[in-house]
Amino acid sequence: MALDPSEQHLRHVEKDVLIPKIMREKARERCSEQVQDFTKCCKDSGVLMVVKCRKENSALKDCLTSYYKDPAFYEECKMEYLKEREEFRRTGIPTKKRLQKLPTSM
């Protein structure tokens, strides 16, 4: 059974696992300042990080949650996923491998 590369239907695993994974990655990039602050606090605090890093943890959670709840952000990530899936269905090469196999000139 050949799959239509441009088909827009999403399977359960795509909606509930793969697209949220892209959302997490992109949200972490966009909240990089809060991620860095929280990471630094945890490294500096050691065992007491649970108590000492509450402010940084709250700021990070607020930033990430704002993206997770944004319907436009979900649509952006969904379209990115559909584009990658379409490319995979046309070429048979996963995105990560395609990016790794780019020729380098020296």
Swiss-Prot record:
Its main location: mitochondrion. A motif (Cx9C motif 1) lies at residues 31-41. Disulfide bonds join C31-C63, C41-C53. Transmembrane segments: none annotated. Residues 28-71 form the CHCH domain. Component of the MITRAC (mitochondrial translation regulation assembly intermediate of cytochrome c oxidase complex) complex, that regulates cytochrome c oxidase assembly. This is COX assembly mitochondrial protein homolog. It comes from Bos taurus (Bovine). The gene is CMC1.
